[in-house]
């Protein structure tokens, strides 16, 4: 890696400690990975691995999935943000086109994050205060 190194065990711990969910879809539109954090927003089952991403979304949103993938592959767009209110939470969902150094499309990263707590922040917290 150009900026350091870590073991697979360390990488797994990093991916599962991040305070958001991640799902990776490869250039062939197959789901290849999802993080397994303690508080996943959208539950994932290993059965989705290697499945076409279009079969992982409700039929009503299939055209949106197709549009995002088409725009990412063509280079027209590099990210697609959404936010929804569900179950009393504000969820931010962002899709990012992953590209190599030549700009070639490698796949899509979906990042989902419960931002409810951030929306309530006021002022500063400059002194250490652990959440109990």
Regions found by a protein language model. Name each.
Residues 4, 8-11, 114-132:
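Juxtadomain coupling helices with adjacent low-complexity linkers
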